Amino acid sequence: MTVTKTNLNRHLDWFFRESPQKIENVTSPIKTLDFVKVKVSSSDIVVKDSIPHKSKNVFDDFDDGYAIDLTEEHQSSSLNNLKWKDVEGPNILKPIKKIAVPASESEEDFDDVDEEMLRAAEMEVFQSCQPLAVNTADTTVSHSTSSSNVPRSLNKIHDPSRFIKDNDVENRIHVSSASKVASISNTSKPNPIVSENPISATSVSIEIPIKPKELSNNLPFPRLNNNNTNNNNDNNAIEKRDSASPTPSSVSSQISIDFSTWPHQNLLQYLDILRDEKSEISDRIIEVMERYPFSSRFKEWIPKRDILSQKISSVLEVLSNNNNSNNNNGNNGTVPNAKTFFTPPSSITQQVPFPSTIIPESTVKENSTRPYVNSHLVANDKITATPFHSEAVVSPLQSNIRNSDIAEFDEFDIDDADFTFNTTDPINDESGASSDVVVIDDEEDDIENRPLNQALKASKAAVSNASLLQSSSLDRPLLGEMKDKNHKVLMPSLDDPMLSYPWSKEVLGCLKHKFHLKGFRKNQLEAINGTLSGKDVFILMPTGGGKSLCYQLPAVIEGGASRGVTLVISPLLSLMQDQLDHLRKLNIPSLPLSGEQPADERRQVISFLMAKNVLVKLLYVTPEGLASNGAITRVLKSLYERKLLARIVIDEAHCVSHWGHDFRPDYKQLGLLRDRYQGIPFMALTATANEIVKKDIINTLRMENCLELKSSFNRPNLFYEIKPKKDLYTELYRFISNGHLHESGIIYCLSRTSCEQVAAKLRNDYGLKAWHYHAGLEKVERQRIQNEWQSGSYKIIVATIAFGMGVDKGDVRFVIHHSFPKSLEGYYQETGRAGRDGKPAHCIMFYSYKDHVTFQKLIMSGDGDAETKERQRQMLRQVIQFCENKTDCRRKQVLAYFGENFDKVHCRKGCDICCEEATYIKQDMTEFSLQAIKLLKSISGKATLLQLMDIFRGSKSAKIVENGWDRLEGAGVGKLLNRGDSERLFHHLVSEGVFVEKVEANRRGFVSAYVVPGRQTIINSVLAGKRRIILDVKESSSKPDTSSRSLSRSKTLPALREYQLKSTTASVDCSIGTREVDEIYDSQMPPVKPSLIHSRNKIDLEELSGQKFMSEYEIDVMTRCLKDLKLLRSNLMAIDDSRVSSYFTDSVLLSMAKKLPRNVKELKEIHGVSNEKAVNLGPKFLQVIQKFIDEKEQNLEGTELDPSLQSLDTDYPIDTNALSLDHEQGFSDDSDSVYEPSSPIEEGDEEVDGQRKDILNFMNSQSLTQTGSVPKRKSTSYTRPSKSYRHKRGSTSYSRKRKYSTSQKDSRKTSKSANTSFIHPMVKQNYR
């Protein structure tokens, strides 16, 4: 017997009552789970026993070997042997009548009932119910036995006289098929209901389940008739009448439901049911399609889902009409003139049985207990076959609840975990993150209209003999302090110290009416009060925590210690534009000042800021523009002198720190603003900073004694997983196709070429909706792809790591790293772009140790001193340690890096380690490590880490035998270990500093990493036995010899904080914070042939690092250009049948690919290019090079460097005097001067109103990045107008090609300041 939508509730009830052990050998009739239900203020409270936690997917509890089977293919379920004649009906229906199921009918017949007809009968009763008083158990609601009082829609279908006998004590209207009966009971007893509009014209009674006797006697509700003397006779009568019932298919098409006559509250309840059923059917369809692709069972659910969609549309239309009408009927919000019917298509209802009316348990509980709820959040909840009743409330009865009733009500088990609050996104940060929420209760919220809240308020009032709480009051909490799984909810009080500031009422008003939010998340209110008090504030919040609101809301407050313009320094134009778009929708005057704007727009912005009445609230600039632009400096000076500079905000503040993973030199100069604008409060915000980075930010920005606010970094909805990088595309497709085909995701790659290859492979070979996104694309194309992805046309975006920082998309369900990231900070930030809506999301990293060579090459070719590069290597080693760790919880490792203690018990299988069932033990690998050290010492020449490991394992490869390495002492010792443990051992020795990998380039420009001994002090500690090398190995792995000792599995995690070079699996500390730069060799242990190891090909290194810094993008361009140049050379050689010497050698082509000469003259400057070859062969090769020159120029067009403010030729700030304290610019040296804000602008002034209108109109027309509709580009060539900034500087060429020619040349002349970023600042923000 297969579980279906119609009988799933029976199976669930029976399954949780009987254990799996009882299922197989069941011989007695199965007793279903009792449902105990009582009505309190017309809200159904359901209490059940032995029901799993509601957040758990009920399908997870089913065992394939026992009862439940969801497909047609598997017919081994033990339920196949059960007979429904032995199954007792649910006790919930006993007071009136059980659903009689003929014993002769099969389960398949039971599934074929026309559920639409049953729903119509039920809903006819539902809509005919006026808002009633609360009905207790043991009493039946009744009005008349006359058949003329039967609902009209049922009279159209059935003749009640065929079923009703005048002398029956209980009369019923039966709508039945061959295998199922729906009964609507009527009694002849009078109705003792207290109501203003009692129902007297309807011969219908409502089936209400029994409440236990001990409670029902105390509640002041009418009673149900519990006379069951005629039950047996009625059952027999029902079975006899089945044959006389019309078939479902013959009547389905005649049923139409007039939703316009329903009470408003009933419509809301019914809408929740429809949405829940549609969601469940959709989940079922997707599950069957993906898990059982050869089954066609899902097809029968598609028409059901379509009918539900039509019903939802009909109900929403009525609700919309109700909202637009003047309804004074309380909860009975009907629209007499609105005729909105739903008639199910006969073709559909005849083919497919409609699902039964079943209500998820959580929906019943939510509708009766939750102050604020979204029905769509209910998914995969346990469902129960619960008849639906009106939730309308008659308020006079609320005051009749007595103290004894309250005590008995408290016996019900209402789990705090069932209270959920849908928190609205506080500006760019999606809802649902694990953070605290302060919910503001006011008269316009619908919280107070929930029946259970009113009952609870009345109950508390009865106990305390106090009056009911008023819905408009902020003085007391409604339900006090409540906790659920994700949020700690605090109702604010005006007596609360956080709301006792002079500006508190203005803050609450702006939150509601300006930003349309209902509350604050954790630390938001504290940050707002801090900055409005004139304090410096440092905010550390995870992605999705609501950082932007902390400075956007204070910007519109007039009552703070400072008022005027809030200066926001943001690193990315896309991030700026995203916030500006949101502020524009809120009508908050906010403007950018960037080189991306046309000159006339920049002049307009400056005019708004220099006006007498400055109405601009937020001004967004980039750090590069602030450091190099005199115009911005003059504007800020004017605002400061007029007391109109409110605060300075540094977004993404981790860019300030040298220790940060994304250091920007221009951010380092922001500390000078402290001297220039004395008395102005600073605010620094970041989502990724450990303790060292935080202290560096505070010291650099001179924010001593600032208010520090830190939220938890934990993202409980993210699942972390690391997979080996083997059979990558198969693994990618397997993951995406297993439940993620229709979901949005990001795949991060290391280079632009990888992005294109991965996207093309997934799109062409696997049919996935994937597209690449990177800086090599034209700006218009990038905008189009991003918009298509955000709208859902593309499900997967394959991009480089910068993508996603400025993208506001909360429903990203997975983030995949094609290669491991450069730091744990970067990993946390990139994975944080998934699941910002609070729903579960998956984070996967494909790990291969050899990928680190690419990062080593970038570090080697990058700018910065030895200390800077060593810090980069430290961050890289930490990522390797994180990936190699097989025992410690992933979440715990990440949070430990940020200095947050986390118990892995709370991970709840939220990572691959916690889901791992394998047993790991600690193995002492010190003896093996000593043999590896001796082996490396005895090797003459260069060897990679892989070659050293092969020698250690006794490999007999040709190169090893040729060099005689197989005869060295220690060769073959590692045979006792399996290869996986050997690899992890050598990687562990590298992370511990015992071995060091030295990256070098060969003559052809290819980079290799050769292994050499590390610091002598570390090696000596291992040789002396002071440092033990401990490795986690699977218990089934090959064991070392008896000399190794086994340790118990570690229960603690060594800290990752403070950049200590320690292994997460080792028991030793190796602090790097106080360590000097490693010397590769020490005099106490000289290499056998140091000249060979130290030797470098200096010419090749100079060729490779002719520029002191080459970004990842530039290396990618160089590689592709070199490939095309070699291809051209091969074609020319084939035509002329000549040798390489007749053309350009590989080294010459490499220089051409790096320098990208534009003409023959520049080509001649390359070493090895003769005049003859330059003239004869140069034009052909220059045509290939020109393509890459154009690409780089297009890429520079979207950079955040402001070309119109100084020059595109500057990568770093050259005019450092722009931030100096010179008296000529009018700044005072008086450090004791007090900065006082200006007076607020008076509202109502015509000039002010006109200027505000001009600013808002300008905001709607400004074109920083054109995030709206993407314009069509007429031509790829572009010519600047004659009044461009280059014309003012006397440039002789205005063509776009010429515009970037100087930039192309001078970009090689980078500053000598340390830059720890792997990606060049000029191209970083668009290198996606």
Swiss-Prot record:
Locate the residues binding ATP.
A555, V556, I557, E558, G559, G560, A561, S562
Q: Which residues form the HRDC domain?
A: 1115-1195
Quote the disruption phenotype from the UniProt entry: Increased sensitivity to UV light.
Q: Where is the composition biased (Low complexity)?
A: 217-236, 244-254
What are the recorded GO MF terms, alphabetically? Answer: 3'-5' DNA helicase activity; ATP binding; ATP hydrolysis activity; DNA binding; four-way junction helicase activity
Q: Which EC class is this protein assigned?
A: isomerase
What keywords are annotated for this sequence in UniProt? Answer: ATP-binding, DNA damage, DNA repair, DNA-binding, Helicase, Hydrolase, Isomerase, Nucleotide-binding, Nucleus
What is its subcellular localisation?
Nucleus
The record ties this protein, via SMART domains, to: DEXDc, HELICc, HRDC, RQC
Cellular component GO terms, alphabetically? chromosome; cytoplasm; nuclear chromosome; nuclear replication fork; nucleolus; nucleus; RecQ family helicase-topoisomerase III complex; site of double-strand break
**UniProt feature, compositional bias: Polar residues:** 1260-1269
> Any idea of its EC number?
5.6.2.4
What residues does the Helicase ATP-binding domain cover? 528-707
Q: Catalytic activity annotated for this protein?
A: Couples ATP hydrolysis with the unwinding of duplex DNA by translocating in the 3'-5' direction; ATP + H2O = ADP + phosphate + H(+)
Motif DEAH box covers 651-654
One GO BP on record is: DNA damage response
Q: Where is this region: Disordered?
A: 217-254, 1224-1247, 1260-1328
Provide ranges: composition bias, Basic residues: 1283-1300
Where's the Helicase C-terminal domain?
728-876
InterPro entries named in the record: DEAD/DEAH_box_helicase_dom, DNA/RNA_helicase_DEAH_CS, DNA_helicase_ATP-dep_RecQ, Helicase_ATP-bd, Helicase_C-like, HRDC-like_sf, HRDC_dom, HRDC_dom_sf
- Gene3D superfamilies referenced in this protein's UniProt entry, alphabetically: HRDC domain, P-loop containing nucleotide triphosphate hydrolases, Winged helix-like DNA-binding domain superfamily/Winged helix DNA-binding domain
- What is the protein's known function? ATP-dependent 3'-5' DNA-helicase. Has a role in the repair of UV-induced DNA damage in G2 via recombination-mediated repair. Also has a role in the repair of infrared-induced double DNA strand breaks.
> Which NCBIfam families did the record assign?
recQ_fam (TIGR00614)
The similarity annotation says:
Belongs to the helicase family. RecQ subfamily.
Known partners and oligomeric status: Interacts with top3.
Entry protein name: ATP-dependent DNA helicase hus2/rqh1
**In which organism is this protein found?**
Schizosaccharomyces pombe (strain 972 / ATCC 24843)
